[in-house]
Amino acid sequence: MRTAKKAGLAAVALVLAGALAFGLLMLATPAAGNARQLAKAFDRQHGAPYPGVAVPYRFATALEATEDHRFKEEPGVDPVAVLRVVYGTVTRRGDQGGATLYQQLAKMLYTPGQANLTAEAKQVALAIKLKYSYSRPEILRLYADVAYFGNGFYGLAEASCGYFGVPPDRLSWPQAALLAGLVQGPSADDPIQHPAAGLAREQHVMGRLVAIGAVSQPQANAYLQIPLSTLLVNAGACVG
C-alpha cells in the first residue's frame, strides 16, 4: 500500500515538475507574433521573393499529406514525435522524423542551423505559440515562403519558377508532389542534381496523396509515368 502511495506521489511530482518546466520554457521563449517579419527578413537575406499569398491547394495538400497529416487537428506538436526527436538528438541518429509543420516552421524562423536539446525544446514551445498566433492558412503561407527546396531556391515561388517555369498556382499534381517531397532533404533529393532521389520522393508523396484520397491510384500511376525531363522542361522561365 505504501509502495503504491509513494509511486503515486512520485508520479504527481513528476507531472508537476514537467508542468513547471514547460511553463518556464514558454516564458523563456519569445512570442511568435513577429513570424511574418522574420519570414520577410529571411527571404531578403537569401534574395528570395516574399509573396505572402495563399498557398495553392495542390502544394498545400501534398505538403500536409507527407509532412504532417494531422495538421488540421493537432495542438502544434505531436508528443510521441517529440520524444522521437529527443531520442534522435541524444543518440545522434537524426531527428527520427515526425516534427509537425509548426515545429519545422519554428526551427526555420527561430533556431536555424541548431541541432541540440535546447533548440528542440524551444521549437516545441514556439510551435505551440505559432499554433495559437496564426491561422492554418497563415502557417502554410509562412512555411512556403521560407522553406528551402534545393538548388538555391528559397520559398515556394522561387522553387516553382526555378524547377518548372510556372507560378505556384499552376503547379500540376506531380510537380506539387515533387516540391513537397524536397523539404526534408532539399539537397539530397534535388531533382536536377539527383534525379533518382527526386523521383523517389515524388513517388512517396504521391503515395501519401492516394492514402488521403486526394488523388486516385490510377491517377497517381499516370502521373508517375511522366518523365522528370518533361516536368522540368521549362525550368527557370516562369510563365504568367
Please annotate each region the language model reported.
Residues 1-240:
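Juxtamembrane regions of bacterial inner-membrane/periplasmic proteins
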